[in-house]
Amino acid sequence: MTARLQEFYKEQVVPALMKQFGYKSVMEVPRFTKITLNMGLGEAINDKKVIELAVGDLTKIAGQKPVVTKAKKAIAGFKIRQGYPIGAMVTLRGERMFEFLDRFVTVALPRVRDFRGVSGKSFDGRGNYNIGVKEQIIFPEIEYDKIDALRGLNISITTTAKNDEEAKALLNAFKFPFRN
């Protein structure tokens, strides 16, 4: 069974973007490649339990087990040695990616405190979009009573779009709430 947004993309988004940008082939139309969720955990240096709790949160949010990221090199100023666990990340592709995107746009984003829309300036120049989430409790999978601390995460949406304009049109087609 395909995800709801995956069918929406094939049936409505592709024809609309082909008309808007004058693409000749369906393969030219921008599409999502992957969504990466990354949680940087600087406080994990002092407390090893933080990593386990963050991995648990990311597992609930993404629906798959994240990878613990380790420091590439030692930084004395931050008291980090090479190989220390300093974060967790998970990459979503295919059906899980579309299901996450659906939950994120329809459920999680409206739950953000004082939400006025996401920034339209967070594109990287190559058609990819990044969003910083300050609190993991905006996701319905996280139970408010069972969290130990509020942790933010970075959500990186990678597309096949050639430029920011095409990527923004793709995200707009999926009802992304841009404020500017």
Curated annotation (Swiss-Prot):
It holds the Pfam family Ribosomal_L5. PROSITE patterns: RIBOSOMAL_L5. InterPro entries: Ribosomal_uL5, Ribosomal_uL5_bac-type, Ribosomal_uL5_C, Ribosomal_uL5_CS, Ribosomal_uL5_dom_sf, Ribosomal_uL5_N. One of its GO terms (biological process) is translation. The keyword Transmembrane helix does not apply. One of its GO terms (molecular function) is structural constituent of ribosome. One of its GO terms (cellular component) is ribonucleoprotein complex. Keywords: Ribonucleoprotein, Ribosomal protein, RNA-binding, rRNA-binding, tRNA-binding. The keyword Transport does not apply. Part of the 50S ribosomal subunit; part of the 5S rRNA/L5/L18/L25 subcomplex. Contacts the 5S rRNA and the P site tRNA. Forms a bridge to the 30S subunit in the 70S ribosome. Belongs to the universal ribosomal protein uL5 family. This is one of the proteins that bind and probably mediate the attachment of the 5S RNA into the large ribosomal subunit, where it forms part of the central protuberance. In the 70S ribosome it contacts protein S13 of the 30S subunit (bridge B1b), connecting the 2 subunits; this bridge is implicated in subunit movement. Contacts the P site tRNA; the 5S rRNA and some of its associated proteins might help stabilize positioning of ribosome-bound tRNAs. This is Large ribosomal subunit protein uL5. It comes from Cupriavidus metallidurans (strain ATCC 43123 / DSM 2839 / NBRC 102507 / CH34). The gene is rplE.
